[in-house]
């Protein structure tokens, strides 16, 4: 994680109110090598928890979740912020604060991809 810390110090921007802008390597533009290193580190740290799936929120969490899933050999499910017409009527839905949007956002997951018996590892860009 030293690589991530160094990159935040080099390219991150503090915007105030607890907001750290990392658009140039995590959110808007993605550094694949950095995300791969993060995924490898997360995989090493969580290899023995028995997770069956990785869960994240669209959109910024997808890159670190995907590389973690790749290194753990696990599928990745991401919570949608809007319900597409292809999703069933019955869904898992919760509200979560979005500090960058300044409001609550819906997070929606289809039960087709997240069963009751899943052991879920949550990976996101900031927790």
PLM feature spans:
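Short, glycine/charge-rich flexible loops or terminal/linker lids adjacent to PRPP-binding catalytic cores
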Residues: 74-120
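Active-site-facing substrate-recognition patch
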Residues: 1-50
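Acidic, divalent-metal-coordinating active-site segment for phosphoryl/phosphodiester hydrolysis
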Residues: 126-127
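Short Gly/Thr/Asp-enriched flexible loops that form oxyanion-binding sites at enzyme active sites
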Residues: 63-72
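A generic local structural motif
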Residues: 40-42, 63-64, 106-109
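Short glycine-rich phosphate-binding loop at a beta-alpha junction
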Residues: 50-58
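Short, flexible loop segments at the rims of nucleotide/cofactor-binding pockets, characterized by
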Residues: 30-34, 55, 97-102
